[in-house]
Amino acid sequence: KKNKRSGKVENVGYLDLEQDEEQSRCSLYFYGDIVSATWESMWYEEDRCPQDIADFLNQLDGYEDIDIYFNSGGGDVFAGLAIYNQLKRYDGHKVGYVDGMAASIASVIMFACDELHFATGAQAMIHKPLCMAYGNADDFKAVIKQLNLCEDSILDVYMEHVQEGVTRDKIQSLMSNETWFDSKKMQQYFNVEIEEKAAVAACASDFFEKYNNIPEALKGIDTKDIVDAVIAELENRNNAAAEAEKQRIEAEKQQILDDLYLYGM
């Protein structure tokens, strides 16, 4: 994307970015896991961290509308809350599309959108935040306190988007039971629009093994095939880049030879 301040074309935080100059709209994709640091998101191009989103938003004018697409199995809860707040503060109109899945913290991020569309067959999942910890009893008490605070923050987000009559206790119960929603069930509890289109291909996530009630349709995903396809695509990109660089060098060599010939050398 061309940076409107510097005029340079830049890689915007490893994000897939499309821009419609006439309508002043951009597209942002969450098609991988939510991670805490840039070095983690560099391992897999589809993963996202808060700094990626900051880089993305910093290159917009602050009023451009954003279409945000979701097919994510979730990830780091603090990174996800940071991304939610970044997007929530952004002044442009944000339209969210759950194409395949918005699980765990990804289901929080999607509610940063001003309007939300749910594809027929798409899935969402809400649950209590979880973590790994070690230490003494005091350390674990501190972790429990932090998890409860996170749960309250997540509940606050969900409650801003529930249907009339849905109580906080009900959403908290659904979180405790790790509840998966199809598009129809999602609309029973939350203010979302259902789109008459099929969900996209299955999402590969490192966080599936941490969930308890994964729908049968998701259990059969062969993530190895997906990883192999991603690796093959990256290799193709690297080969294409290497070939382009080779052609550039050859062109420069030819230009030098032509200049030497022009001056009789």
Residue ranges of each PLM-predicted region?
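N-terminal organellar transit peptides
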Residues: 1-105, 113-265
